């Protein structure tokens, strides 16, 4: 099941990013909810919240090391919690989605923008980012419930 989640997450991320490249990269913005939610193309050459700008090689290496660590953990410990395995699968699919962008584009395609008028703008993000955040929350809940 975890492999299917990872594959589905990567496919969903790729489809939405290809759509953003085609429809939004020319500077076109699609407003979904006026003054609150829109699709707006951004080439993110860093990590979350714009940190590590221009450090593509570092980000690729860190992502690869983390993926190797996760695979090692799953092979060695074979976790039994379905909730935890699903959460980690979300994290892996999101990480691999953004890794693909970094390797092939040298930046990550972001396009989801939440803002309040012109007063506040949350950093632009993508489906892979959502998967990583949801998976991390699930993993944290699992760890808190298990007391480990």
Swiss-Prot record:
Subcellular localization, as worded in the UniProt entry: Cell membrane
Entry keyword set: Aspartyl protease, Cell membrane, Hydrolase, Membrane, Protease, Transmembrane, Transmembrane helix
Active-site residues, record numbering mapped to chain: 110, 129
Keyword Transmembrane helix in annotation: yes
Pathway as given in its UniProt record: Protein modification; lipoprotein biosynthesis (signal peptide cleavage)
Catalyzed reactions per annotation: Release of signal peptides from bacterial membrane prolipoproteins. Hydrolyzes -Xaa-Yaa-Zaa-|-(S,diacylglyceryl)Cys-, in which Xaa is hydrophobic (preferably Leu), and Yaa (Ala or Ser) and Zaa (Gly or Ala) have small, neutral side chains
Alphabetical list of InterPro entries matching this protein: Peptidase_A8
GO molecular function: aspartic-type endopeptidase activity
Family named by the database record: Belongs to the peptidase A8 family.
Protein name in the entry: Lipoprotein signal peptidase
Organism: Clostridium novyi (strain NT)
